[in-house]
Amino acid sequence: MSKLHLYGWLYRDSDKMLCVGQNRKPNILRDKNIIEEIEKIAKIKVDTTEGLGGRRTYIPNARMRVYAIDDVCNLDEAIGSLVDKLYGEMFTNVRNTGYSEWTITGLHVEDFRIGGHDLNAELDRYIGQYIHFILEYED
């Protein structure tokens, strides 16, 4: 499986798109739009009759994880903070503030939905926090 790993401070840009940046203050020239980054790796287009019909971007066999943390950290520290929150056996310098995982047979990129989950709404609760966003998919 291949992996897309985005990390940074989560916010919405002026177009209300979810982005991650390395500073708390947004910088649209450097920061990454999550949906645009996913579209770069999506290779499958499917026909649809929804709305006006046409073709939509779709990633089969997708698995997504989001770690939300109170401060800048690497992925290992983010995972450690979740373990610490659940079991109290790890000592980390950051505090886990949220975790979500979705394993469904496909990700609809334009709608930003996986299964019946609206990822825009799901990720809204992490706005303003440092996140590690991981999408694993088959090539």
Which role fits each region the language model picked out?
Residues 2-125, 130, 135-139:
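Short beta-rich binding modules
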